[in-house]
Amino acid sequence: MSKEDVIEVEGKVVEALPNAMFEVELENGHKVLAHISGKLRMNFIRILPGDKVTVELSPYDLTRGRITWRAK
């Protein structure tokens, strides 16, 4: 899957789950299960419930995603 195939959407973290997984509610109301991308993990970026995040979704599975950015 190339970089052009992903769908980027904004959302809000609803719940922090084990193993660096998060439940994120998207702007359109859907809830997805998302994990932290490698760059956020390497730089120890903390993500807490209530944070606004950018999520990348695969066109093949729209229920799972990757958190790529945390808004300030």
Curated annotation (Swiss-Prot):
It comes from the Bacteria. This is Translation initiation factor IF-1. NCBIfam families: infA. The keyword NADP does not apply. One of its GO terms (molecular function) is translation initiation factor activity. The keyword RNA-binding applies. It comes from Acetivibrio thermocellus (strain ATCC 27405 / DSM 1237 / JCM 9322 / NBRC 103400 / NCIMB 10682 / NRRL B-4536 / VPI 7372). SMART domains: S1 (SM00316). Belongs to the IF-1 family. Residues 1-72 form the S1-like domain.
